[in-house]
Amino acid sequence: MDSLSRLLALYPMRTALDVRCHFGAPFVLQQDAAGAGIAPYHLILQGQARLTVAGQPELALQAGDIVLFPHGGAHTLHLSDATLASAPVYEVASASALRTVVNDGDGAVTDILCGQFTWEPQVSQALLAALPPCLLVRTQGAVHLAGLQSLMKLLQQ
């Protein structure tokens, strides 16, 4: 067992996919701060988005990007002016067990999977404190992340 595996064994975590967002631009997806021990994440499966986090420069996200918030910080994903209202969002029936939401935006399509990692709050403090407020992994064109790219393609179906 390597060092990282031993470290992660000390901090058991769970993960869950919460919702699939299939939006046409313009859209604004705001997420409030999560509770202790909850780290939300988003996988950009198709299209693009902008990420706004208070006190941080805005980031451009594209298909293949994974963004994680180890401290559960509030953030906004959007493809428009983040201060404007987006096209109304509503839930649709889906063949999958995953909740799916869409909007009536008629612009470029962005497909996002949203989920969260959860740890016991008192156990996770030491590990998560060492991480920045936002982690971005760009898988597009990264040969060493081929397994992660394959997983994202599988989840897209």
Regions found by a protein language model. Give the residues of each.
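Generic protein-terminus/edge-of-domain signal
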Residues: 1-66, 73-103
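Residues immediately flanking
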Residues: 46, 71, 117-119
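Short hydrophobic-aromatic micro-motifs
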Residues: 67-70, 112-114
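Amphipathic alpha-helical segments enriched in hydrophobic/aromatic residues interleaved with Lys/Arg
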Residues: 101-157
